[in-house]
Amino acid sequence: AFTYPGFKYISSFGKRGEGPEEMISAENIRWGGDNTAWVLDGSKNRLFRYGGIAPGQEPKLEENISLDKAFMRPLDFDLSGADSFVIPDYSGENRFSWADMSGNLLHKSDCIPITDEKQLKESAPAVAQGWRSFISFSPDKKLLVTVTQLGDVLDIYNMENGRHINYKGEDGEPEFHVTSEGYGIPAGRMCYYDVQVTEHYIYAIYDGRKFSDIMKEKEYKQGAKQLRVFDFDGKLRKEYMLDRPVTGIYVDEAGHCLWATDVNTDNQIVKYIFD
């Protein structure tokens, strides 16, 4: 952990595992406020909460939460408030699953907005895999935004009035094949890598390369170069082309800068200034 924006080292947290039961494979990390961080391990179906992440404090594991079995290997999550969180529903029955802070399923909501409703009905788990999404809440928790990893689709869900806005770009919905075992196998493009909702806009990093073209590349670099900026009505307002592919983003609107992770180099944190 580091201070921001000075990036002064504070401390490290998370015990180094000495066996399979002690290893944490982090799918995502969310800052929970009050010097705490939440870590999702999808392979174990668990959430870990670390406290004391601040100068002068000693970080420690405070909660080890086993998620309800209804969560089928969660790959992303976000805190929806002080008493609950949301995870994409990988069963295909709905779009989201909501849980309390003990990992118990509260309810499910919304549906995957696929055009082929017949395919959803017949192969729901495969569709959920093909529509794997990254999610982000707005700071006030009023908007929940999703972007699809395998398609050019962005959805905005208003938590107050139930309004749903669906944006489909030129590259269309996720393309995938359904195997005889019922799995969804990618067949089209690599699209969104990350999304962040701020007080004013939605920022998402987008690739768009076909898998067939990626396979031909001699030196494949993971990530995307295109930064898209949407308003809260789902309208694309700006596009920036970065000088390298990145996988994760953090936008500091007040500081007019973008922080991104470049996993293809040893210097993995890069900074961009924008208007």
Per-segment meaning from a language model:
Residues 4-6, 51-55, 100-104, 158-162, ...:
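Short loop/turn segments that connect beta-strands within beta-propeller blades
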Residues 8-38, 42, 65, 243-247:
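Blade-loop segments of beta-propeller domains
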